[in-house]
Amino acid sequence: MDFPSRFDVIVVGGGHAGTEAALAAARMGVKTLLLSHNIETLGQMSCNPAIGGIGKSHLVKEIDALDGAMALATDQAGIQFRTLNSRKGPAVRATRAQADRILYKAAIRHKLENQENLWLFQQSAEDLIVENGAARGVITQTGIRFNSKTVVLTAGTFLGGVIHIGLENHSGGRAGDPPSIGLAQKLRALPFRVDRLKTGTPPRIDARSVDFSQMQAQPGDDIDPVMSYMGNRAMHPRQIECFITHTNERTHDIIRAGMDRSPMYTGVIEGVGPRYCPSIEDKIVRFADKNSHQIFIEPEGLTTHELYPNGISTSLPFDVQIELVRSMKGMENAHIIRPGYAIEYDYFNPQDLKYSLETKHMPGLFFAGQINGTTGYEEAGAQGLLAGLNAALLAQEKDAWTPRRDEAYLGVLVDDLISMGTKEPYRMFTSRAEYRLILREDNADMRLTEKGRELGLVSDERWAAFCKKREAIELETQRLRSSWIVPNTPEADSINPKLETPITHEYSLLDLLKRPNIVYSDIANLKNGLDEPVDEQVSEQVQIAVKYAGYISRQAEDIERLRRQENTELPDDLDYSKMEGLSNEIKQKLTQLRPATLAAASRIQGVTPAAVSLLLIHLKKRAIARKSA
């Protein structure tokens, strides 16, 4: 039967990509359906109970800047907050939060249920409705037809999912959930390039069976950072400690002895696993010279005894899992609540996508999350928001939008996937961004919120808060510029101990802040005519802008040079096979990938600077030929 209502956007899957996609589309004002096989698992943290980290928190902040849900849900559920790389420069600082699974899921569910224009429905999607080659809805397992203008697939690890524990395996999307077999088969019949990837999770431990006195405590920051620009510390639940233990030679011997029953090392699993989150088996093989590995013992929440031992993801047989867990200090009597496992699943080559995340082979169909070969909640959420936004724009017959590499880590993520593809689960790092001094986690709102408002993503409440913050930054910068310190005054005497040489002439507070030994707090109250303290988000922006002005200016110049090249479009009808001077390999890649711009072509693996120059020459000749025709 046909469902009585017709939708503009249907989102399939209720994980981190799906929830952000559905919320984004609904915020755009279009009628949106979120379809999940089980609405009790919406927003579930399937693996580690944490949000953020190096590179990842930048994505979370960008989601937040565009009014997404992840950052605020983290503030409402975070039970430990830390700033990573706090002693390094602002470009690579990152916020990481340990989250209470139950509180996080509840925060996401609350957001979904109270979002205008969004409907929820519990059913598995088994097929697509296709009209004239375009996606026009989905058919569920019970035969209900949901019609729509666009479809966003965020299937996670569910497409053809197979769970492995030792040499035993069974079909599953994750532990306790069925896989999506019918939809996987339907998608495989379409002209998409499909392959298999693998990820894994560690066994979960009962905290009552662990001796924490034998471990190193790892508390959060004394002043816990806030994840959302709209969040505050008062939102945070009770804060608790994590702990650290280590593997040892005995642990490694146990693992080596079990390798003959490892699905990874006996060829049972063919999918490639994540390079930067390897299983404990992988660590022992790849880092054979190391006799110990650090393991982080992370509580799963405030109302559960369950622990997540971060660092021992494994698909070894359960008897080996028991032995290896109990070989570690403090875990000698550990009781495993859930076994660790690996899961193998289908993913689709992201080079078959447009930059909007719409598929090239089927108009109206968008992919987001692990289906595109990424790993991580943050990467999934960011893609979901972009796919939901662009599905809504397409439903409204408006042009798509994707941030550039110099505008957002989301732009880096999408460009990497589409220009280079991936053969292993893709994880975001700050090192992937050329312009990371501009793409900091602290300024994501300054980069994206205005654009989000223009697109229709950003609420009145967030927009008002953003405008207030932006104005405060301008006012405080102006105050520092116009406030002067002269020698032999109480103000000068208070700041001189911080300087290498005392003040000998008049300085503005802005110039003083440029000094390497001076931080904002040193000058905040000098010549301060303000009624109340400056908000820490405001003072942070002021300080970074002053301290790094020269570097930021140089990056802006680099970006402008690249942008001139970025805007050089490569027409769809270019016949690369007839271009003289290009190697056959480059011709093949350009024909297959059809990059939209010269800059996009330059980022394709194997496309040399010389080849880019040849393309530019060809475009100029083509333009001259057309003018004279």
UniProtKB/Swiss-Prot annotation:
Pfam family, one: GIDA_C_1st
Gene Ontology biological process terms in this record: tRNA methylation; tRNA wobble uridine modification
PROSITE patterns: GIDA_1, GIDA_2
Binding site for NAD(+): 273-287
Coiled coil: none
Ligand binding (FAD): G13, G14, G15, H16, A17, G18
Recorded GO MF terms: flavin adenine dinucleotide binding
Subcellular compartments: Cytoplasm
Major subcellular location class: cytoplasm
Keyword Cytoplasm among record annotations: yes
UniProtKB keywords: Cytoplasm, FAD, Flavoprotein, NAD, tRNA processing
InterPro entries per record: FAD/NAD-bd_sf, GIDA_C_N, MnmG, MnmG-rel, MnmG-rel_CS, MnmG_C, MnmG_C_subdom, MnmG_C_subdom_sf
Entry GO terms, CC: cytosol
Cofactor: FAD
Signal peptide: none
Assembly and binders: Homodimer. Heterotetramer of two MnmE and two MnmG subunits.
Function statement: NAD-binding protein involved in the addition of a carboxymethylaminomethyl (cmnm) group at the wobble position (U34) of certain tRNAs, forming tRNA-cmnm(5)s(2)U34.
Family statement: Belongs to the MnmG family.
Name of this protein: tRNA uridine 5-carboxymethylaminomethyl modification enzyme MnmG
Species name: Marinomonas sp. (strain MWYL1)
